[in-house]
Structures are given as C-alpha cells and as structure tokens.
C-alpha cells in the first residue's frame, strides 16, 4: 500500500466521503453517479470534498473531477484499513466523514467520532446478497444488515 497522504491546511470545511466505488470505477452505476453529482454540486469555495475508494486498473490514485478530489488506495477489502489510516493521519483536518452504505461499509463507528459521522444509505441490500454472494456469506450478510445499520443510529446525520 502506498504511503498515507497528508492533507494540506485549508480554511474550507473538509468532508471525507467513503465509498466502495467511484464515478470512474469499471462497475460504477447509479449510486456512484448520484454520489458524484451530489458531491460535485457542493460550494467548493466553502467545502473541500475528498472521495476515498479502492484503486482499480487504469485508475489514477489521486485526481480531481468536477471539484471533487478522488483518492484511491487498496482493493475492495484493504480500502477500509487504507481509509482508516488516511483518516487517522488527517483527523485534525477532516470535519465530517460520510460512510456510504451501498453493499460495502467502512464501519466508521469504530474509528470516527460520532459528531463527525454522516451515514449515507444509498440502498439496502438484503435481496442483493443472494445475487452477489454464495452461501454462507449471502445468509450472513442478509441477517447482519439490520444489526449493522443500528451501529450508525447515533451518527451526527443519517441520509437516505
């Protein structure tokens, strides 16, 4: 894994958005388009947006698209620890963290203070588990969805 990027000081509010795919990912779909559109429409004079997701073949590890800085590290599994390391190295410069729930989670209640967490539910995935995974992972995923959603009930905000 590449070294941890240190953010430069910036007077703007800094929002770190965590997602398992970004707008350029090979399997990007509606969630990624929606997320990019929301983030790109922020007032970038007041808000610095950093989107963190896994690196994929042909992707730049660091690029800016429509005012959103895209950082890519790790893979579908290691991106969580990469995001955690990035947050820890920059926590004093990050004001809010958006954990996007779209099949994949970043488990921010374990490493981001409650007052900084924003939980964004793009879609619930109970019915997707049988399509995307095989037994026993599919059964485990379906049964853990509701208890795992409860982890975020005390976040600063929950967006659906």
Language-model region placement:
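N-terminal subdomain of nucleotide-sugar transferases
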Residues: 1-55
């Amino acid at each position: 894994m590449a070294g941890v990027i240190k953010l430069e000081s910036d007077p703007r509010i800094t929002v770190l958005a965590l997602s398992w795919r970004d707008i350029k990912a090979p399997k990007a779909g509606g969630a990624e388009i929606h997320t990019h559109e929301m983030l790109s429409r922020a007032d970038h004079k007041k808000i610095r947006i950093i989107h963190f997701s896994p690196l994929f073949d042909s992707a730049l590890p660091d690029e800016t698209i429509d005012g959103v800085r895209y950082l890519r590290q790790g893979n579908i599994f290691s991106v969580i620890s990469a995001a955690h390391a990035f947050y820890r190295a920059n926590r004093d410069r990050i004001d809010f963290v958006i954990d996007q729930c779209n099949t994949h989670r970043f488990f921010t209640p374990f490493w981001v203070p409650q007052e900084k967490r924003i939980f964004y539910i793009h879609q619930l995935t109970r019915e997707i588990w049988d399509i995307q995974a095989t037994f026993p992972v599919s059964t485990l995923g379906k049964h853990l969805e509701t208890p795992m959603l409860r982890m975020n009930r005390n976040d600063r905000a929950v967006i659906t």
